[in-house]
Amino acid sequence: MTNIRKTHPLAKIINNSLIDLPAPSNISAWWNFGSLLGICLILQILTGLFLAMHYTPDTTTAFSSVAHICRDVNYGWIIRYMHANGASMFFICLYMHVGRGLYYGSYTFTETWNIGIILLLTIMATAFMGYVLPWGQMSFWGATVITNLLSAIPYIGTDLVQWIWGGFSVDKATLTRFFAFHFILPFMVSALVAVHLLFLHETGSNNPSGIPSNSDKIPFHPYYTIKDILGALLLIMILLLLALFSPDLLGDPDNYTPANPLSTPPHIKPEWYFLFAYAILRSIPNKLGGVLALMLSILILAIIPLLHTSKQRGMMFRPISQCLFWLLVADLLTLTWIGGQPVEHPYIIIGQLASILYFTILLVLMPIISIIENSILKW
């Protein structure tokens, strides 16, 4: 009799995705982040569900409902901090996953890559709206500043902002709709993840060498299931260390002050995972220009496949491109640091130079260096 996992309509899908899936024999730990992102998503949905049971999306009670979760709900504190720090772990895994795609040329799977960009944008939107919900000072002013950026859109800008706010300022209507969207978006993310995997399984995984691995495949289970479990244990261990020992390490102290429309915090800044984009936004003195640069800093990923000029797929055998890639990583870390600093000399000029370098590396240097490497190898 044939095994039920190979015949049952539902079990068959799981079997072909997680058990009998042919996988390259040489994929490294950089290929672990996909499964880690899946674990992060499940964790966030579960902790978020339990938080939503006790949270009230109302300007008068939102802040105190979060305090109530931490003080009065059984294990509410750990659920809240797992959710808050889970978002940070989510973005660490996301950036590593995207970085891996850039380094090893995984973006040549254009459908998978494009769905990945949509996923990234959706997750960023979800995280932004989630940050507004505790209704602390940074929640309120972060929401005000970021939504206000849309007013830079010519002609319809102001109307658009007021439409999103549901009034003339960030208020009760804004909080309620942000809660509704924050709840629904992770399920949309889950659906997009299924599409992401669907496209990936059409082609199979890339591997560090960038050479087709059809002649040397191994079953996903047990080799990569055990490898994924190791990654998951490390992820959960780091998350628990964060949540239990220093839960507020990555947060902003201002968010422990209830939202007050009459007092602006001295330094308005988003969560650490948005600081690089925030630094790019602030580098341009013009409002519309800043908003465009902010959008392009993420959307530039969409044209990366068009800028691939190398005859090789990944960077494994391209040392000059490797140097450029790590320069890009250092540049992004610099931007992250600048995003958290006040707008004053020397931070302004450092941010501007780092922003220019970011776009120059991706749009100019990478394609040119790839062509030079081709000629060095006489290809």
Curated annotation (Swiss-Prot):
UniProt KW Transmembrane helix keyword: yes
Parts of the chain that traverse the membrane: 33-53, 77-98, 113-133, 178-198, 226-246, 288-308, 320-340, 347-367
Record membrane topology: Multi-pass membrane protein
The protein's required cofactors: heme b
Family in the record: Belongs to the cytochrome b family.
Quaternary structure and interacting proteins, as annotated: The cytochrome bc1 complex contains 11 subunits: 3 respiratory subunits (MT-CYB, CYC1 and UQCRFS1), 2 core proteins (UQCRC1 and UQCRC2) and 6 low-molecular weight proteins (UQCRH/QCR6, UQCRB/QCR7, UQCRQ/QCR8, UQCR10/QCR9, UQCR11/QCR10 and a cleavage product of UQCRFS1). This cytochrome bc1 complex then forms a dimer.
Protein name as annotated: Cytochrome b
